[in-house]
Amino acid sequence: MKKKLAMLLAATMLVMLFTGCGAGGKEDKGELNLYTWDGMFPQEILDGFEKETGIRINYSNFDYDEDMLAKLEETRGSDYDLVIADDYIIELAIQESLAQKLDTSRISTYDNLNPVFMSQFYDPQNEYTVPYGAGIPLI
């Protein structure tokens, strides 16, 4: 199970490696600056990803989406390659020009993404985001 999770993370990260948030202009293929909720990925999964890909993950986390947005505003998004956050915060980050457009030609599996999860309200033209996982509301 752990190996499957590590492979899933590896595939996901490689797909989204070029989704950089800011226009920092630096491209270091040996590192991935990830910013998401605390506890999103167990350390053993991150370690497995690094071991299998050779890509070092600089994992920063936040507790609240608003804290994440404040950090992106402070750095103009340039400190992170990949941010995983809630939809309404993604919409604000795009509106504030804190995210850069995707170069989908560099994402080899882009055409395999399920269209059901594409064209969301926060990115209707799929210019800035790719789906990471499906959220299903529960009652």
Which ranges hold each PLM region?
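Short, low-complexity disordered leader/linker segments with a strong preference
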Residues: M1-L32
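Short hydrophobic/aromatic-enriched beta-strand-loop microsegments
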Residues: C21, N58-S60, K101-T104
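Early extracytoplasmic/lumenal segment of secretory-pathway proteins
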Residues: G25-L92
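Glycine-rich, phosphate-binding/catalytic loops in enzymes
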Residues: E50-E52, A99-L102
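A structural signal for short loop-to-beta-strand junctions that line the ligand-binding cleft
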Residues: S78-D87, Q100-I139
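Phosphate-coordinating loops and pocket residues in cytosolic domains that bind phosphorylated ligands
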Residues: Q95
